[in-house]
Amino acid sequence: MRASAILAVVALIVGPRGAEAGAKEFHAVIDGSQAHPPNPSSARGIGHFTLNAEQTELAYSIEFESWVSNEVFSHIHVDAAGNNGQDAILHDLPNGSSKKGVFVLKEPFMLAALFNGFLYVNVHTLTYRQGEIAGYLLPGTPAEPATWGRLKALYSR
């Protein structure tokens, strides 16, 4: 809780990076190398996220493929660095290879965690109970030059 309080104070004092008016785009490239712990799964996914102008809701559209076994559940987590040394579930995602919905950012630390790269998607399966694939939410869209090569490599497997 202490880290959450610190992030909330920082967010209120200096504001999150990129907190200008208007909707913000985020993306996640999701695979086994980012799972906690990493694994050799061939499953992969991509997520598109839009933070509304009021910075209170994060709409998401996430697609997955090639799971090793059946999905058990999936979530949006805050990682240990953004939550006092412990990963925590912030939002449950619907089951299935296509996930659409809205995550309401109820606490200031959630917005700070989003802008500082501490939020990630994690998909748990029967084979990989701790998470078969995961991916951090990053600013921008996947077509930006910094991520396009990685996406191209991901989908050309």
Where are these regions (language model features)?
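Metal-centered catalytic cores of metalloenzymes
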Residues: 16-74, 78-149, 157
